[in-house]
C-alpha cells in the first residue's frame, strides 16, 4: 500500500513537472482595470496547472478580490493613498481625458502628456513604497520566486526582478508611439508603413500621412526620453546603486507577451522573444441570467444590439444620453445598454439599462447583430472572436486607433462621441446591421482569430513556464538592445565607409595631380633642351 501511494505521488509530481515546466513560484506585478483582467486570465491557468502565484498589490488596489474563486496569494504593501482616493484620481483623470478636444495635435497630446505623467508619478511612488519596505522585500527574497510576471505599462516589475535576481516576462498591450517596445524590446516598427499607435492611421498611408506618422514617432521619442524617463532613470540608478536607465532595465525581459493579434494588427516584422496573445480572455458564451435571456429571446428575428462604453466611464451628460437613447429607440432590434446613470427621458421600450452586462456572453449569442463600443481592446477582441460588426465611439487613449484598425478592415463604422447626432448613430447602426459586407469582414477576422495552432492563452502560459524551466530565455533576445542608436542604424559603419571612399578619392586625386605635375615638369625640360 505504501509503495502504491508513493507511486501515485511520484506520478503526480512528474505530471506537474512535464505538463507545466515544473510547478514554480510566480510573483505578479500588475495594473488595474483591463490590465488586471487580462493578467488574471493567465494567472487562473497557471494556478490550475499547479503553480504558486503571488500578486504584489498596493493597499490602494481597486479591483483585486482576495475572495476570488481561484487560489492566489496576496502580498499587500502599504502606500499613502487609500482605495477611495486612488479610484477618485483615476475617475477624474479619465473624465478629463475623454473631454480633451482632439482637433489640435499639440493641445491634445500636451494635455494627455500631463495626465500620463500624473499617473506615472503615482505608480513610481507605489514602486518606491515596495522597494523601500524592508519587511516586504525580505519576505520576497525569502520566498525564492522563480519568475516575475509584470505589466510593462506599469514599471517596477523589472526593478524587482533585478533586486531579486530572477527572470521576468512582460504582458503589454502598447505604449505611446511604441516607444518602450522599440527601445527596450527591440521590436521593429518602420514608420514608412507601420502606423504608430495613437496616430489613427492605417498601413496604407499617403505621403503626408507618412510625414504625420514620422512626426508622431519623433514626438513620442522626445516625450519619453527627454522628459518622463529622467525621473525613472534617476530612481532606478539610486535603487540599484549603479548608473542605469528604465529602458536598459526593461530590455532584460526574457519574453514579451503582447496583447495583440494578427486578426487586429497590421503586419510588421517580429522578434523571437515576442508573441502575440491578444484575445486570450475570449471564450464561448455562457448562459445568460433568466431575465436577460427572456429579453433577448423577445427580440425575435430582429435580434439584439449590445452597447457598452467600458468599465471606467460611469456617467455622461443627460444631453448625450438622450441623443443616444433617441437613436436606439428607432431601431427594430432590442438593445442591452450598460449604463450607470440617470434614465434618459428618450429611452425607448426596446432598450434596457444595466449597470453591468456579461459582454462576452451577449456577443456570443446568435441573435446579436451589432456591438456599440468605445473601442477598448478587450471588447474589440470579443467582437472579433464572436464575429460581431461594430459601431465605434472612441473616447481616449488607444480607442481611436483600435476603431481605426477595425474600420480599415471593413468591420466597423466610427462616430465622434461629442459631435454625433441621433441620426448619425441611427445611420451607423443601419449600415453595420444591413450591409452584409461588415458581417462578412468581421467573420473573416473571427476565422483568423480562431484558426491558430495553439490558442493565445496556452501560448502565454507556455512562455512563462519555459522561462521558469530554463531560468530565462536570453538566447531569444536580439543583440539590438545592446547597441546605441547610431550603431543600430549602422551610421558609424556608413560614416566609416564614406570616410574610406573619401580617403581613396583624396589619395587618387592627389596622386593624379602629382603625376600630372611631374609629366608637365618633364615636358617643360624637354622643350628647353
Swiss-Prot record:
Which GO terms of the cellular component aspect does the record hold? Answer: endoplasmic reticulum; endoplasmic reticulum membrane; nuclear outer membrane; perinuclear region of cytoplasm
One function term, GO molecular function aspect? glucuronosyltransferase activity
- Membrane topology field: Single-pass membrane protein
In the UniProt record, the signal sequence range is 1-24
Highest taxon listed in the record's lineage: Eukaryota
Name positions with the PTM N6-succinyllysine.
135
Q: Which reaction does this enzyme catalyse, per its entry? A: glucuronate acceptor + UDP-alpha-D-glucuronate = acceptor beta-D-glucuronoside + UDP + H(+)
Q: Which tissues show it?
A: Expressed in the liver, breast and kidney.
List all disulphide bridges recorded for this chain: none
Q: Which residues are glycosylated?
A: 315
Q: Which PANTHER family match?
A: EG:EG0003.4 PROTEIN-RELATED, UDP-GLUCURONOSYLTRANSFERASE 2B10-RELATED
**Name recorded for this polypeptide:** UDP-glucuronosyltransferase 2B28
What organism does the UniProt record list as the source?
Homo sapiens (Human)
- The gene behind this protein is UGT2B28
Amino acid at each position: 500500500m505504501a509503495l502504491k501511494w508513493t507511486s501515485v505521488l511520484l506520478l503526480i509530481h512528474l505530471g506537474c513537472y512535464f505538463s507545466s515546466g515544473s510547478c514554480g513560484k510566480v510573483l505578479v506585478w500588475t495594473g488595474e482595470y483591463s490590465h488586471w483582467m487580462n493578467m488574471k486570465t493567465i494567472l487562473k491557468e497557471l494556478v490550475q496547472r499547479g503553480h504558486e502565484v503571488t500578486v504584489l498589490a498596493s493597499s490602494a488596489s481597486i479591483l483585486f478580490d482576495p475572495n476570488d474563486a481561484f487560489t492566489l496569494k496576496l502580498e499587500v504593501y502599504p502606500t499613502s493613498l487609500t482605495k477611495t482616493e486612488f479610484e477618485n484620481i483615476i475617475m477624474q483623470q479619465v473624465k478629463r481625458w475623454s473631454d480633451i478636444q482632439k482637433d489640435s495635435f499639440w493641445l491634445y497630446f500636451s494635455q494627455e502628456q500631463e495626465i500620463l505623467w500624473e499617473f506615472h508619478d503615482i505608480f513610481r511612488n507605489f514602486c518606491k513604497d515596495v522597494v523601500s519596505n524592508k519587511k516586504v522585500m525580505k519576505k520576497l527574497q525569502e520566498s525564492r520566486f522563480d519568475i516575475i510576471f509584470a505589466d510593462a505599462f506599469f514599471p517596477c516589475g523589472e526593478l524587482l526582478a533585478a533586486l531579486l535576481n530572477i527572470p521576468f516576462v512582460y504582458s503589454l498591450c502598447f505604449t505611446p508611439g511604441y516607444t518602450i517596445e522599440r527601445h527596450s524590446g527591440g521590436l521593429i516598427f518602420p514608420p514608412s508603413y507601420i502606423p504608430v499607435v495613437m496616430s489613427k492611421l492605417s498601413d496604407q498611408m499617403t505621403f503626408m500621412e507618412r510625414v504625420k506618422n514620422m512626426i508622431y514617432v519623433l514626438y513620442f521619442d522626445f516625450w519619453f526620453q527627454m522628459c518622463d524617463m529622467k525621473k525613472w532613470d534617476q530612481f532606478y540608478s539610486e535603487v540599484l546603486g549603479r548608473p542605469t536607465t528604465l529602458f536598459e532595465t526593461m530590455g532584460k525581459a526574457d519574453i514579451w507577451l503582447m496583447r495583440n493579434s494578427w486578426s487586429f494588427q497590421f503586419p510588421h516584422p517580429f522578434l523571437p522573444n515576442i508573441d502575440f496573445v491578444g484575445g486570450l480572455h475570449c471564450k464561448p458564451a455562457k448562459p445568460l441570467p433568466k431575465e436577460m435571456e427572456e429579453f433577448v429571446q423577445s427580440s425575435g428575428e430582429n435580434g439584439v444590439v449590445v452597447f457598452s462604453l467600458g468599465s471606467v466611464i460611469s456617467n455622461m451628460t443627460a444631453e448625450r444620453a438622450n441623443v443616444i437613447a433617441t437613436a436606439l429607440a428607432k431601431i427594430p432590434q432590442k438593445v442591452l445598454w450598460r449604463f450607470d446613470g440617470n434614465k434618459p427621458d428618450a429611452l425607448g421600450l426596446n432598450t434596457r439599462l444595466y449597470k453591468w452586462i456579461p459582454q462576452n456572453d451577449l456577443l456570443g449569442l446568435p441573435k446579436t447583430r451589432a456591438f456599440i463600443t468605445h473601442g477598448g481592446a478587450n471588447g474589440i477582441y470579443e467582437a472579433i472572436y464572436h464575429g460581431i460588426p461594430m459601431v465605434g465611439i472612441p473616447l481616449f487613449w488607444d480607442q481611436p486607433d483600435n476603431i481605426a484598425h477595425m474600420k480599415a478592415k471593413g468591420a466597423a463604422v466610427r462616430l465622434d462621441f461629442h459631435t454625433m447626432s441621433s441620426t448619425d448613430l441611427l445611420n451607423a447602426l443601419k449600415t453595420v446591421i444591413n450591409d452584409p459586407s461588415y458581417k462578412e469582414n468581421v467573420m473573416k477576422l473571427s476565422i483568423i482569430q480562431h484558426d491558430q495552432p495553439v490558442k493565445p492563452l496556452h501560448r502565454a502560459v507556455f512562455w512563462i513556464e519555459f522561462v521558469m524551466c530554463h531560468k530565462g530565455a536570453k538566447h531569444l533576445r536580439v543583440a539590438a538592445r545592446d547597441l546605441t542608436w547610431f550603431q543600430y542604424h549602422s551610421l558609424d559603419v556608413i560614416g566609416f565607409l564614406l570616410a574610406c571612399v573619401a580617403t581613396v578619392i583624396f589619395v587618387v586625386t592627389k596622386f593624379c595631380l602629382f603625376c600630372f605635375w611631374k609629366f608637365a615638369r618633364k615636358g617643360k625640360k624637354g622643350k628647353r633642351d
